[in-house]
Amino acid sequence: MPVCKNCHGTEFERDLSNANNDLVCKACGVVSEDNPIVSEVTFGETSAGAAVVQGSFIGAGQSHAAFGGSSALESREATLNNARRKLRAVSYALHIPEYITDAAFQWYKLALANNFVQGRRSQNVIASCLYVACRKEKTHHMLIDFSSRLQVSVYSIGATFLKMVKKLHITELPLADPSLFIQHFAEKLDLADKKIKVVKDAVKLAQRMSKDWMFEGRRPAGIAGACILLACRMNNLRRTHTEIVAVSHVAEETLQQRLNEFKNTKAAKLSVQKFRENDVEDGEARPPSFVKNRKKERKIKDSLDKEEMFQTSEEALNKNPILTQVLGEQELSSKEVLFYLKQFSERRARVVERIKATNGIDGENIYHEGSENETRKRKLSEVSIQNEHVEGEDKETEGTEEKVKKVKTKTSEEKKENESGHFQDAIDGYSLETDPYCPRNLHLLPTTDTYLSKVSDDPDNLEDVDDEELNAHLLNEEASKLKERIWIGLNADFLLEQESKRLKQEADIATGNTSVKKKRTRRRNNTRSDEPTKTVDAAAAIGLMSDLQDKSGLHAALKAAEESGDFTTADSVKNMLQKASFSKKINYDAIDGLFR
């Protein structure tokens, strides 16, 4: 409710006598509102007498009125106008109806609202919007058509299209018809005069695959590639899988899988002539996924039935050697063996399920309870089996009681041993010593320590290695030469570089051009008596430097070297000057007379 700014009153009255329809406060008479915005179109008159429209129009997406002509349009409005113009130009070139263009413009506005247009080329976004609208209407236009019209890479448009679908959450986008790809693939395969016939057969194969539920969930390029390959074979044209893969850009395994799925349909069993004449509309094949799952279920069921169909007790005992350990050396019939085998399998499955269900809670306690209970039940079942096959009353009863007592004592001893500190696995509480299903002769098998104890620690001792094994690692002369050629071929560049360095070094030594800088070595105080000459030379050099008062020590060093007899002073100066490039301003012949 409006409030007066002067007297804070809340009662107002509209002055209808005034053209501006002012809103006046009844208490103090202050005008609260004047010149309100109205929806009526009003006209005025200029100083020249021309009639003009008063006011301005504000659209739904505008924040304020536009002033100054067309150049004063908002940036958003200018962007939409440019996009509409470009959409119409592309639609006109590709013969796209106007209603699809309007739908593409709505997709563009939605992309602009989600900040998808910023930072992307406008041509890619426009092509993506048009392609989405065409896919919704199931037209024959493809991305390659927009690419050729806009002169943009089809992969660039495809990447923008995929990002746009993900950004705008575009769902229920109809799949492209494989028959659209068939024409493009046929043009790249160079089918000559049989192109029309191959395309016709491939389209019919695609329609047949669509009826047989092979189209749903598959890439259209894979379906089109398989149809093109079959159509070429139907027309006696030799086209390999590699050629189809290069054209359709799908994997060879995908192409072969489409062919295998089509092989299980009714249309695949017809001849070429019957397939062309008959539409095969009498029945549809089941989806490939349905057939594949039924085959898996049938295979599992057959394997289970085969395992349970034992004719004799020997087959059952050979199938499960643990059952032999449980039943001992008793003579049982086939039905009894199967009965105990079923009970044994059920008990073991329950133990495994219990351990899996309680994984990570307390594996040791769970295993103790399960293993002890199952061990007790197994012992009691042995007693019951023996009682069923032994006749008598008193003796058998006494023997059974004694065996039950033995079972109880054994279980209590096992419990004490487990509590005393037997090793239990920290993950699932497993212990090999208390495993009721462990084979009896497991302790007779050699362990890892037994094998390691036989291996000598001496690396040069090869007594434990057979001669045949050593000979297998030795190459004969032919294999050695072949391996040498391979190594030289792999390292040819390095060998050539090293050889060139060696030849260059020999040539420099022969010509006396030894200008290679030697690495500086750290001087050490050497006081050994086995090098008297170096000490004498150093002392002589120091004396010469002090006599000549040469700060640099160049003359002293040259004279010391000359006295030692290694080379003359002139030769050393020549060698020093030869290190640098030759100069026209130096008379090298005059160097011989410098130190005479």
From Swiss-Prot:
Residues recorded as bearing Phosphoserine in the entry: S381, S384
Sequence repeats: 90-166, 185-264
Annotated GO biological process: DNA-templated transcription initiation; DNA-templated transcription open complex formation; regulation of transcription by RNA polymerase III; RNA polymerase III preinitiation complex assembly; transcription by RNA polymerase III
Chain intervals for the UniProt region annotation (Disordered): 363-421, 509-534
Binding site for Zn(2+): C4, C7, C25, C28
Keywords, alphabetical: Activator, Metal-binding, Nucleus, Phosphoprotein, Repeat, Transcription, Transcription regulation, Zinc, Zinc-finger
Main location group: nucleus
Other comment: Present with 4330 molecules/cell in log phase SD medium.
Function recorded in the entry: General activator of RNA polymerase III transcription. Interacts with TBP. Binds to Pol III subunit C34 and to the TAU135 component of TFIIIC.
Protein name (Swiss-Prot/TrEMBL): Transcription factor IIIB 70 kDa subunit
Native source species: Saccharomyces cerevisiae (strain ATCC 204508 / S288c) (Baker's yeast)
